[in-house]
């Protein structure tokens, strides 16, 4: 899973295998060991979009129905997009399935 942060924007990209695992009920995790403070993002499928935090972990839930609908229209350049209201203001959340999934292009 690839994570990209910008001000008020979070973009997640997963490969085909990760997308299949997420839809099957697995939790996708990415972590970073900052000096003195580790950070972890867990992505799961659920009933509705929501974000929860606990210590160093952020858990992001995406609606299973939206993930299933996205699967029917792959390959698709546009993924899922949500606006999540946070205490600091709205967050633009984007979820995409990597169409190339690590394959190299011929030169």
PLM regions and their residue ranges:
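Short, structured motif recognition centered on aromatic/hydrophobic residues
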Residues: 3-5, 10-14, 58-62
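Extended Gly/Ser/Thr-rich low-complexity repeat segments
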Residues: 20-33, 68-86
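C-terminal charged interaction modules
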Residues: 78-107
């Amino acid at each position: 899973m690839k994570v990209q942060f910008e001000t008020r924007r979070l973009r997640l990209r997963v490969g085909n295998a990760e997308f299949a695992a997420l839809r099957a009920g697995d939790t996708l995790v990415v972590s970073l060991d900052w000096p003195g403070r580790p950070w972890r993002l867990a992505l799961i499928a659920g009933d509705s979009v929501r974000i929860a935090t606990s210590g160093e972990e952020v858990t992001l839930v995406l609606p299973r129905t939206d993930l299933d609908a996205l699967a029917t229209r792959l390959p698709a350049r546009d993924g899922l997009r949500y606006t999540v209201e946070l205490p600091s203001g709205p967050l633009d959340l984007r979820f995409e399935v990597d169409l190339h999934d690590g394959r190299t292009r011929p030169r």
